[in-house]
Design a protein with these regions (language model features):
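Selective recognition of specific alpha-helical transmembrane segments in multi-pass small-molecule
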Residues: 53, 57, 151-163, 226-252, ...
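Hydrophobic transmembrane alpha-helices that form the core helical bundles
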Residues: 31, 65, 78-113, 289-306, ...
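Hydrophobic alpha-helical segments and their helix-loop junctions in multi-pass secondary transporters
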Residues: 93, 97, 153-179, 197-198, ...
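Hydrophobic, membrane-embedded alpha-helices of multi-pass small-molecule transporters
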Residues: 11-21, 162-169, 177-244, 280-289, ...
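C-terminal membrane-solvent junction of multi-pass transporters and transport-like membrane proteins
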Residues: 351-416, 423, 427-428
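TM-loop-TM module centered on a large, flexible mid-protein loop between adjacent transmembrane helices
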Residues: 69-75, 240-290, 297, 341-343
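Membrane-interface loop-to-helix entry segments
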Residues: 135-163, 339-351, 370-379
Length: 428
């Protein structure tokens, strides 16, 4: 087969959506809706740019470059290896994978209890099941695309349908002070926190494996199908974010002052369906977290198997699942203190790599733009994210530094310098 059918392409898109859509993606839109109130839709536009547009652009950029290693290698081959390892570890066993179990258990706890033994037993079953599903990374479509993602979407539609039929308020409420003006920018900043753009750089390889497992062998067709799957996943993210955000805006109007998106969803589910609503919400969280966990275990295991082919993929997948289980129960808080600053340092670099990749022939015409732009950005983002004393204070004092965008000016300087300078020719 040289081309995917529409149905199979849709399944691949469902698979990618389910890998993206974790607990944070559930929590952020209703929280945004509750806080933005009558300014929800302008804020949603900003959220769509940073939480949907950037991740989809990341999938497209990696597919066009034929892999993250080639994309990051435009800076330097050594940079590519270090960057990839840091990303895989940060969004994998050092942060995102352990949090899938701890977050989903937190939503189950009101129903089953909060004992340490219960959490340990849950996490063992959770990661064992995720490991078994991830054992065949090229067949994730069978589980995520065909079964688990449709189940998740049906449950979300039930919750949203209840909100449509029995809204908690007749109209949106008053916005919080930060959304009174500049709601679009606030939405961009809020969507920026999902950090799905980093995940997008990693998911492309697994999606390509699943496309090839459908019988597609031509590299051009794999690339095209990956890009189309990215747009399918982006469309689903946009629709689900809109539903959750609208529900959050009405819930926030009915019950002002809710602290988090999880609180918003809990109030919504409880008022619509009572205890059955809390069971529904817990099922949504467990499914969303499980899907993301499977995708991340597959991505991290496949990458390290590629680095060390002598170690089989199941060994890496099992190791990362077991390590994540231990971290989620024993040392998650300590790991978060280390991994979150690393993620904050990596994120601007990832955004710039994606943006630069869409400039035609940039690498050929101005080969220094990539290393200088990424180098300047990395210096600022590392100094801003890590406690480096006066250097950190200087990095945060740059324009837009107060809102986490202090890297914009160094990136612009790097781009300008890269366009003006020429590499020194090597002596024969």
């Amino acid at each position: 087969m040289q081309k995917l059918s529409g149905r199979k392409l849709l399944l691949i898109g469902f698979t990618l959506f389910s890998m993206f859509f974790g607990a944070g993606n559930l929590i952020f839109p209703p929280d945004l809706g509750a806080k933005a109130g009558i300014h929800f839709w302008p804020a949603f536009l900003g959220l769509a740019i940073s939480a949907v547009g950037l991740p989809v652009a990341g999938v497209v950029a990696v597919a066009r470059a034929q892999g993250l290693e080639k994309l990051a290698g435009r800076v330097h081959p050594v940079f590519a290896q270090v960057f990839m390892i840091l990303i895989y570890l940060s969004i994998g066993p050092c942060l995102a994978i352990p949090r899938t179990a701890s977050t989903s258990f937190a939503m189950l706890a009101p129903l089953v209890g909060t004992g340490a033994g219960l959490q340990l037993g849950y996490s063992v079953m959770f990661f064992a099941a995720a490991f078994l599903v991830a054992l065949q990374p090229e067949k994730l479509t069978r589980w995520l695309g065909r079964l688990l993602c449709p189940c998740l979407l049906v449950l979300i539609l039930v919750l949203f349908g209840g909100c449509l039929l029995h809204p908690l308020a007749g109209q949106y409420g008053a916005p919080t002070p930060e959304y009174t003006s500049g709601a679009v920018l606030q939405g961009v900043l809020y969507g920026y926190q999902t950090m799905d753009t980093l995940a997008a750089l990693n998911f492309g390889a697994i999606i390509a494996l699943n496309i090839q497992a459908q019988g597609v062998t031509r590299q051009e067709e794999v690339q095209c199908s990956t890009i189309l799957a990215g747009f399918v996943a982006g469309g689903l993210l946009l629709a689900v974010y809109a539903m959750l955000g609208h529900a959050g805006a009405l819930t926030g109007a009915a019950v002002p002052g809710l602290a988090t998106g999880a609180d918003v969803l809990t109030v919504l589910a409880d008022r619509l369906f009572g205890k059955a609503g809390l069971v529904l919400l817990a099922a949504i969280f467990v499914l969303a977290c499980f899907n993301t966990c499977v995708g991340l275990i597959a991505c991290v295991g496949e990458h390290f198997h590629t680095l060390v082919p002598s170690v089989p993929y199941p060994a890496f997948a099992g190791f990362f699942a077991a390590a994540s289980m231990l971290i989620s129960n024993l040392g998650l808080a300590d790991i978060l203190r280390l991994s979150v600053p690393v993620l904050n340092a990596l994120y601007p670099v990832a955004i710039l790599l994606i943006c630069l990749s869409f400039v035609p022939e940039l690498e050929q015409r101005h080969p220094l733009v990539y290393p200088l732009c990424i180098g300047c950005t990395a210096l600022q983002s590392v100094a801003s994210a890590l406690p480096l004393g006066p250097l950190s204070a200087l990095a945060k004092a740059l324009p837009f530094g107060a809102v986490g965008f202090g890297w914009v000016l160094p990136a612009a300087v790097g781009i300008l310098a890269g366009m003006l300078l020429r590499p020194t020719p090597h002596e024969p």
